Amino acid sequence: MKKIIAAFDGLNLSESNMKYAIQISEKEKYHLTGVFLDDRTYTSFKIYDLVFQEGVSEEKLSRLKHEDQTKRKNASLKFEQECISKKLNFNIHHDKNYAIKELIHETIFADLLILSRNESFSHHTETFPSRFITETLIDAQCPVLMTPETYTEIEKIIFLFDGHPNSIYALKMFAYLLPSFLSLPIEVISVKSMEENLHLPDGQLMKEWIKRYFVKSEFVVLKGIPDVETVAHLQKERASSMVILGSYKRSKLSMWIRSSMADVLSKNFDMPLFIAHQTR
């Protein structure tokens, strides 16, 4: 039995992320671990503002901390009740140290991480993606399913194929981890430069492999800039599609300078993204 971990902010529980995690665990009959990142340094209130601007009393600070504990407890309880109602194999972890380090460590011992794209564990307003999301996608030791704000039943698979081994690896991991979704139609999208032909990279091998797994497949080759053409092509897609892509395992400096395809898609579409890269 494979193990899925679903990460949650107990102070701001993502209902959508919970639904995706429970649905997948139920369909695939996997063990589900709810990882509640109860980072001691993260609260629902800004201590600096309270202490230095409002002059908060110890009594008020204690009350606010207790309210946070109650929120986290209720979020965990809700997850537990949902899992019980679906008769899932599950357990719950409460990780109390630095959230990003705790989560990356959890991914070493997981087959799949399910995570809301809106998580930040920060009081500061951040441009999308948050630092928390960026570092998780870079350092995760298992594939990541990044979920949108709204839950939608998956009806179609879209695979972004750039001809590189990383993208093929992502598709292999998808087929390995989510076999119940292989009955859905898949659209393979590849974007080439204006100087190149319209042949799918390694077309014969790709089509041969796809047909071993998916019942219905379609192949689309576009020309132009990958980010631009992919976004334009996906405008017609609904939120019921799931996109598979290989995450570029670039340096952290490179990630800050140039957005990845995952960032581009998350900014423009409300679709779940299955992201995988080969760890080294």
Predicted regions and their residues:
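Small/aliphatic-rich secondary-structure junction motif
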Residues: 1-59, 139, 152-221, 240, ...
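Gly/Ser-rich helix-loop-strand patches that form or flank binding pockets
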Residues: 14, 18, 92, 100-150, ...
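A short acidic, glycine-rich active-site loop
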Residues: 56-71
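Ordered, amphipathic secondary-structure segments that act as subunit-interaction surfaces
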Residues: 71, 75-79, 86-88
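A short helix-to-beta-strand connector/capping loop
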Residues: 83-91, 213-218
